């Protein structure tokens, strides 16, 4: 959640920054109005409470002096009713403000490029040169079918479209990639954790998926439980509503989970293959840091994901996202896009974001430094999306006969 005090202090500046994310000015103006209404409600309550305190003192004096308290008692009783009404009004105004504020995205950093969508993102650099093939490279779904690694039709039979089943070497490679990624991240100082695949509403509100993106989530009927869209949600919320001692920071974690997304806004996009699935495997990085550490940790997380791709000999590039393409909770993001020769294009395989204190405010994650409690910064990023890594291996390591060479670093994981 954005800092409402910051918005009050300089509404126009914050409004201008949020407009770079495409936030409607009317929404921000409405937030300002709700905030003013809450301030008025608080003043009304405090005024009535002050009057009550004054009358209570008078009541004691009246009784001590033996004076008639009938009229004063009637005023006290009447004021109690007004206080209860004022407190209820204040609660309603507070809830209205907080609900609206939960729908406002994070403020982008000043150095985030201007732009409306992915076409305005800025390439930082390319890493490794794509291989030149002496034949026309095939796309991954053709290779997966030819080698018997992945069956999309059986995925549909078991569930619906955008599900798949892995067999034989395809399944073994997925398992090998998960272990390789976790080991790689652990060696970079990220502690491995294992978390639930179901979370409650508070966890999703903490990391920013709710209330805005509920249509993209799978919910358990009759319960306030949701399948996780990313490990970012449970891992970040491990420290929800806690005050951490400064010596514990930074906390750096890595986790493997299955992820579940309805992809409600992806109709017609990547309808074939494994690029966009309702269920997929991912290894995540999450860091919880002091504010002054977060930029350094951000660069470290980007480098970890890039080095992992390089270890797998997969050509990729780093891209800085523009304001219009930034995620809801991100203050800044660098995407890593892997080269897919079958598609003759770079495709996203990792997204590393610094949310600053945005998620920490929502999830109430703070740290104590001396006598002061402050909000931490939280960061997250894929390292890596397992299915898309498998896609990249199939396309980049394919041979003319359709067979696929396995990257050397995975050999120990495949006996």
Curated annotation (Swiss-Prot):
GO cellular component: cytoplasm
Function recorded in the entry: Catalyzes the attachment of serine to tRNA(Ser). Is also able to aminoacylate tRNA(Sec) with serine, to form the misacylated tRNA L-seryl-tRNA(Sec), which will be further converted into selenocysteinyl-tRNA(Sec).
InterPro entries associated with the record: aa-tRNA-synt_IIb, aa-tRNA-synth_II, aa-tRNA-synth_II/BPL/LPL, Ser-tRNA-ligase_type_1, Ser-tRNA-synth_1_N, SerRS_1_N_sf, SerRS_core, tRNA-bd_arm
Quaternary data: Homodimer. The tRNA molecule binds across the dimer.
Record EC number: 6.1.1.11
CDD domains, alphabetized: SerRS_core (cd00770)
Upper classification of the organism: Bacteria, Pseudomonadati, Campylobacterota, Epsilonproteobacteria, Campylobacterales
Annotated gene: serS
GO biological process annotation, one example: selenocysteine biosynthetic process
Alphabetic keyword roster: Aminoacyl-tRNA synthetase, ATP-binding, Cytoplasm, Ligase, Nucleotide-binding, Protein biosynthesis
Main location: cytoplasm
Positions contributing to L-serine binding: 230-232, 284, 382
Molecular function per GO: ATP binding; serine-tRNA ligase activity
Family: Belongs to the class-II aminoacyl-tRNA synthetase family. Type-1 seryl-tRNA synthetase subfamily.
Keyword rRNA-binding annotated: no
Binding-site residues, ATP: 261-263, 348-351
Record comment regarding domains: Consists of two distinct domains, a catalytic core and a N-terminal extension that is involved in tRNA binding.
Identification of the protein by name: Serine--tRNA ligase
Reaction equations catalysed: tRNA(Ser) + L-serine + ATP = L-seryl-tRNA(Ser) + AMP + diphosphate + H(+); tRNA(Sec) + L-serine + ATP = L-seryl-tRNA(Sec) + AMP + diphosphate + H(+)
């Amino acid at each position: 959640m954005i800092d409402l005090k910051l918005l009050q202090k300089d509404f126009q500046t914050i409004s201008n920054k949020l407009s770079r994310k495409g936030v409607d000015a009317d929404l921000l103006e409405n937030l300002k109005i709700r905030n003013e209404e809450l301030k008025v409600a608080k003043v009304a309550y405090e005024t009535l409470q002050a009057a009550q305190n004054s009358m209570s003192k008078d009541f004691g004096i009246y009784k001590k002096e033996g004076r008639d308290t009938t009229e004063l008692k009637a005023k006290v009783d009447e004021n109690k009713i007004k206080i209860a009404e004022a407190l209820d009004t204040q609660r309603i105004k507070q809830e209205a403000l907080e609900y609206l504020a939960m729908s406002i995205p994070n403020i982008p950093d000043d150095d985030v490029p201007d732009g409306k969508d992915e076409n305005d993102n800025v390439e930082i650099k390319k890493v490794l040169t794509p291989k030149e093939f002496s034949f026309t490279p095939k796309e991954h779904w053709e290779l997966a079918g030819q080698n018997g690694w992945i069956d999309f039709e059986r995925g549909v039979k078991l569930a619906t479209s955008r599900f798949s089943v892995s067999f034989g070497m395809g399944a073994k490679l997925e398992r090998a990639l998960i272990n390789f990624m976790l080991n790689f991240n652990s060696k970079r100082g990220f502690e491995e954790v294992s978390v639930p695949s179901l979370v409650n509403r508070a966890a999703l509100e903490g990391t920013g998926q709710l209330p805005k993106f509920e249509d993209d989530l799978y919910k358990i009927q009759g319960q306030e439980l949701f399948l996780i869209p990313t490990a970012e949600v449970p891992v970040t919320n491990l420290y929800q509503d806690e005050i951490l001692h400064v010596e514990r920071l930074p906390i750096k974690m890595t986790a493997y989970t299955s992820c579940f997304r309805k992809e409600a806004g992806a109709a017609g996009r990547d309808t074939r293959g494994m690029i966009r699935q309702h269920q997929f495997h991912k290894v995540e990085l999450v860091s919880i840091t002091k504010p002054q550490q977060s930029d350094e940790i951000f660069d470290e997380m980007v480098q970890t994901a890039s080095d992992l791709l390089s270890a797998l000999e997969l050509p990729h590039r780093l891209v800085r996202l523009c304001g219009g393409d930034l995620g809801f909770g991100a203050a800044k993001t660098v995407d890593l896009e892997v080269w897919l020769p079958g598609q003759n294009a770079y495709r996203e395989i990792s997204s590393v974001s610094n949310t600053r204190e945005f998620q920490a405010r929502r999830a109430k994650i703070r740290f104590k430094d001396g006598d002061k409690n402050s909000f931490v910064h939280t960061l997250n990023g894929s390292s890596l999306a397992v299915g898309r890594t498998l896609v990249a291996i199939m396309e980049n390591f394919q041979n003319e006969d359709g067979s696929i060479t396995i990257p050397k670093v995975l050999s120990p994981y495949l006996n």
